Curated annotation (Swiss-Prot):
Top enzyme category: lyase
Catalytic activity, as annotated: L-aspartate + H(+) = beta-alanine + CO2
Residues that, per the record, bind substrate: T57, G73, A74, A75
This protein's encoding gene: panD
TM regions (residue ranges): none
InterPro entries recorded: Asp_de-COase-like_dom_sf, Asp_decarbox
Pathway where this protein functions: Cofactor biosynthesis; (R)-pantothenate biosynthesis; beta-alanine from L-aspartate: step 1/1
Cofactor-binding details, from the entry: Binds 1 pyruvoyl group covalently per subunit.
Cofactors, names only: pyruvate
Protein name per Swiss-Prot or TrEMBL: Aspartate 1-decarboxylase
Purpose: Catalyzes the pyruvoyl-dependent decarboxylation of aspartate to produce beta-alanine.
SUPFAM superfamilies: ADC-like
Organism: Ralstonia pickettii (strain 12J)
Enzyme Commission numbers on file: 4.1.1.11
Length: 120
């Protein structure tokens, strides 16, 4: 049996830009992608801490070191600049993988700077 497990999470990312007219996606600072082991075009689930909205889109690379978290296209309707997001990826795993697996959690602070990286 396969289970869909949390693979990686950017916790409390601050939205820096929302552009309704841009092709859909979520731009994420490349440093944050590396820290969370997330990849461009990977599907992500986003949870808005401010308003409870839950939605999905895919990643595009943002400028390295910029702290960018940009919501584009339809996703821009789900959050405002300054809102806090939890950004997650999931992966199917079998029972053997689940038994020893730990997701990577990147805790973010002001300016989307990395505060800590945990493998819970």
């Amino acid at each position: 049996m396969q289970r869909n497990m949390l693979r990686a999470k950017l916790h409390r990312a601050t939205v820096t830009q929302a552009d309704l007219d841009y092709e859909g996606s979520c731009g994420i600072d490349e440093d944050l992608l590396d820290a969370a082991d997330m990849r461009e075009y990977e599907k992500i689930e986003l949870y808005n801490v401010n308003n409870g909205e839950r939605f999905s889109t895919y990643i595009i690379k943002g400028k390295r070191g910029s702290g960018e978290i940009s919501l584009n296209g339809a996703a821009a309707r789900r959050a405002h600049v300054g809102d806090l997001l939890i950004i997650c990826t999931y992966a199917p795993m079998n029972e053997e993988e689940v038994a020893s697996y730990k997701p990577k959690v990147v805790l973010l602070g002001e300016g989307n700077k990395i505060k800590a990286i945990k493998e819970t």
